Amino acid sequence: MNANMSRRFAGLLLAAVLALPGAALAAGLELKSEALQDVAVKGKDGKVQKKRQAVTNAVPGSEIIYVITYRNGGAKPAADVVINNPVPPQMVYVAGSAEGAGTRAEVSVDGGKQFGALEALQVKGADGKPRAARAEDVTHLRWTVQTAIAPGKEGSVTYRALVR
């Protein structure tokens, strides 16, 4: 990976980590963000298998898997936990890829002001008229954890994005 791409990708990771909500951190929640890629690795048997590893080369078109792990480091259950995460501007969200066991995932196309299902959202088209939102319009993701997180327990949410 060239130096410019390395700096650019490091900036993407830092932006994603710094944008995690302070409210979640104040509630005793510990958050960790990782950027991973699935790479093809040839095994000893000669078969090619996919292996997930930290991103080492991100070129336009590369698919990055963002994993945000949350852990309740407090002494009490953490309730009403919401994790907001921006999609870095150099990335395009992969529609339908936001996941997390026991969570409800939503997207925003207006800088995180309103959230909902992608198919229910609209943006202003080039002609100034409203049009259905598309994956490339997504600016933020939000996961609402459906149950309280017991002390010491953890979980994770993920999404995929393509490098522009």
Where are the model-predicted features located?
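Exported/extracytosolic protein signature
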Residues: N2-R7, A24-R164
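Bacterial N-terminal signal peptides
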Residues: G11-P21
